[in-house]
């Protein structure tokens, strides 16, 4: 099976074009639940692939509005690459999306979800038990944690989720980057540079050097509601045990439109199975 058999073709892709703004990207991420959007530019009448902008980029750079500065380069692949080789590249580079290119032209995107869908359909190997693939380290937060704090925890942990625990340390839900982006909004304002010069009134300062007025610079921030995480999390949890196969779990992920499921041993949280973990079993 090759990348061409699993990828999303260019005709079905949502892209943003340079020049453009962060609001264009945020709109698509919120509307479609994507993790990133390809960036293209028209050069001499031809569409040229430039890079990707992800939801992490928007949150990490709240004051940047230019797509050319927000976007980043990521590994690419070709349509005739094997799905196994592409999956290995996704895992090694921790890239959720591989742009599929033909020269400078974008011909499609291969996502983690595309590969998971192939596993679910039995088109590639999916017989390994997920207990051997799961990540045992779990990022967690509390139901009463303010959303901005929970979002920061997710960012610091370097994972796209936090399992939400109640007062008894039992699973109450899960908060994902998708949940955060859905309620994020861009707020514009101004910040003053101040109207005085440091030490302007000291005895040794040069005479005549005084501040003549404040300057105001435009600012742009991503703002999140300050309510507790329980108001924004997903509370209908799908869990799996370690004896389930990668194919079984892939089918659960596709059916429920999620990127990860908690791994349980009885009723105890034992790990997390992320969609990208399943690619390691191919």
Could you tell me what each predicted segment is?
Residues 1-282:
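Tandem CBS (Cystathionine beta-synthase) repeat/Bateman regulatory domains
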């Amino acid at each position: 099976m090759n990348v061409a058999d699993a990828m999303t073709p260019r005709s079905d892709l949502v892209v943003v074009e340079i020049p453009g703004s962060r609001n264009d990207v945020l709109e698509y991420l919120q509307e479609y639940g994507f993790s990133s959007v390809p960036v293209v530019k028209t050069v001499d009448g031809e569409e040229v692939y430039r890079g990707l902008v992800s939801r992490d980029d928007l949150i990490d750079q709240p004051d940047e509005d230019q797509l050319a500065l927000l976007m980043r380069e990521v590994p690419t692949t070709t349509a005739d690459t094997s799905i196994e080789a592409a999956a290995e590249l996704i895992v090694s580079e921790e890239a959720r999306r591989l742009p599929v290119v033909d020269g400078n032209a974008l011909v499609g995107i291969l996502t983690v979800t595309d590969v998971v869908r192939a596993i679910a359909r039995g088109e590639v190997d999916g017989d390994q038990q997920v207990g051997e693939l799961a990540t045992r380290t779990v990022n967690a937060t509390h139901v009463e944690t303010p959303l901005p704090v929970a979002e920061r925890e997710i960012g610091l942990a370097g994972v796209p989720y936090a399992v939400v625990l109640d007062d008894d340390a039992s699973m109450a839900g899960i908060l994902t980057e998708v949940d955060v982006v859905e309620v994020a909004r861009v707020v514009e304002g101004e910040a003053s540079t101040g109207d005085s010069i440091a030490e302007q009134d000291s005895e040794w300062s040069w005479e005549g050097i005084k501040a003549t007025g404040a300057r105001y610079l435009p600012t742009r921030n991503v703002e999140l509601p300050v309510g507790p995480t329980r108001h924004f999390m997903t509370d209908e949890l799908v869990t799996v045990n370690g004896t389930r196969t990668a194919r079984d779990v892939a089918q659960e992920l596709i059916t429920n439109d999620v990127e990860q499921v908690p791994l349980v041993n009885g009723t105890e949280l034992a790990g997390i199975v992320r969609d990208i973990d399943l690619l390691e079993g191919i």
